[in-house]
Amino acid sequence: MKVSLGNGEMGVSAHLQPCKAGTTRFFTSNTHSSVVLQGFDQLRIEGLLCDVTLVPGDGDEIFPVHRAMMASASDYFKAMFTGGMKEQDLMCIKLHGVNKVGLKKIIDFIYTAKLSLNMDNLQDTLEAASFLQILPVLDFCKVFLISGVSLDNCVEVGRIANTYNLIEVDKYVNNFILKNFPALLSTGEFLKLPFERLAFVLSSNSLKHCTELELFKAACRWLRLEDPRMDYAAKLMKNIRFPLMTPQDLINYVQTVDFMRTDNTCVNLLLEASNYQMMPYMQPVMQSDRTAIRSDSTHLVTLGGVLRQQLVVSKELRMYDERAQEWRSLAPMDAPRYQHGIAVIGNFLYVVGGQSNYDTKGKTAVDTVFRFDPRYNKWMQVASLNEKRTFFHLSALKGHLYAVGGRSAAGELATVECYNPRMNEWSYVAKMSEPHYGHAGTVYGGLMYISGGITHDTFQNELMCFDPDTDKWMQKAPMTTVRGLHCMCTVGDKLYVIGGNHFRGTSDYDDVLSCEYYSPTLDQWTPIAAMLRGQSDVGVAVFENKIYVVGGYSWNNRCMVEIVQKYDPEKDEWHKVFDLPESLGGIRACTLTVFPPEENPGSPSRESPLSAPSDHS
């Protein structure tokens, strides 16, 4: 039982605890600590009971204090007064690492728990707090710095953070500069940045709203401000993404700069850009830091599908914005697709085969292949398949694409094709032992795994493994359940098989809610939690180690569905997380690093070198 006295000034509370010997009372004063602190401060002011005098390193001003008080607040003073050091017996101690402004701030804080900070006294206070190990004061200094960062002082705050190793402040300054770099360019404040911070900014994927040409010109301005800075030219230019500039910008603005023609490193950077732009089909397997999209925004992306209403096939490419909790559109395909295959190489999205018209028999399968470049939000067509195919599986493995099985107007397919981006061509590799369609696949350990599907109108439970190095198929342990039109993905060292459908009895289809994972090491299947709702012919993607199953068709409900279910492998739990904008079957999904959509339309910074007029190249 707790009892508080009505007189708030006393600040007393009592805890009553009954016992055999009578009631024991425990009292707590809420004001005692502050009263004691005030008492010690008054003793210090009056010079009473002080047992040591501190002298700052930059003068003769003296500060009488109490050893016990200083030792209780600082490990530095505790070690000095109790650790057998010579200062333990001295009555006057000179502190060479602290000036009088900083020492006074520290002593005032220890005796009052109060601290006033401004930019004039901050560094003196920081230096003293760091030297004397007064952690609360260090924390107050960090808060003061972070709360006051602006365009005018961010460079100076960054210098202070670096000098005193204030990691949180340094990180905040980096983020602030990245977010506001265009403004710093316009004011010229960026010219005050040290090389290390400017190089970090120019290398960052989080740097937005600046073209590579603007960044190059800014780097040149910084280098030319002072002669010694020219020593950093090559190191700084390594952070400019020259391959993403247009050819005319490289010729008109970059090659005209003297050091870009004379410095060997800079010359090689221009050669790299030229070679990259001359080989557009090879770009997915030529990716480097200098060719990557300047974005740290990775999202779940969906493509195509057939709409529930009117059975119209979609050509929409969408990303899910987790913060806004809404879908945003990217550049749509030139033609609609469903039952297609998608895969990602080097953050380029390939869309292969499928159908443009609704047709459950696959008789309208196509062979065309398109590639989406998120850096410019643009599509381009690449080499077509050797065979039209739909209801097939597509994997990206070792820089190649593999299109496995499927069906077409000619019937079910056992053939497998491999796309080589370096040659921009498809070639046949070892085919499957039997034709399959409606199967699923994933990759792990340099191998491609294909599960289930339908062969000669019969649902399968087999698992096959393809080794591209030997061009051979191997049989592995079969699934515990037959299924087709399911999905498959890899998380860690486990290969997950999810959903799909199979025959109920002899003539009707049934959703398969059961799921399982395969261990390649053990060649063994293990059941996991069942789906909340049936989904077949879906999109599947792994995002932040969670599995997202998108849209599809529910055979039990006889309709396309709009739901997105998420599976957490660590918790073995399913959750319905959000919906598609509309119900879509035969949709596909992946994860892709993209620009937020508001940065895409009409932005000159997103102009593809490939779209440059030929008379300027």
Curated annotation (Swiss-Prot):
Domain annotation BTB: ranges: 50-119
Keywords: Cell cycle, Cell division, Kelch repeat, Mitosis, Repeat, Ubl conjugation pathway
GO biological process, one term: cell division
GO molecular function, one term: cullin family protein binding
Cellular component terms (Gene Ontology): Cul3-RING ubiquitin ligase complex; cytosol; midbody
SUPFAM superfamilies in UniProt: Kelch motif, POZ domain
Gene3D superfamilies linked to this entry: 1.25.40.420, Kelch-type beta propeller, Potassium Channel Kv1.1, Chain A
UniProt Kelch repeat ranges: 300-347, 348-399, 400-446, 448-493, 495-545, 546-595
This protein's pathway: Protein modification; protein ubiquitination
Location of region: Disordered: 595-617
Subunit structure: Component of the BCR(KLHL9-KLHL13) E3 ubiquitin ligase complex, at least composed of CUL3, KLHL9, KLHL13 and RBX1. Interacts with AURKB.
Name under which the protein is recorded: Kelch-like protein 9
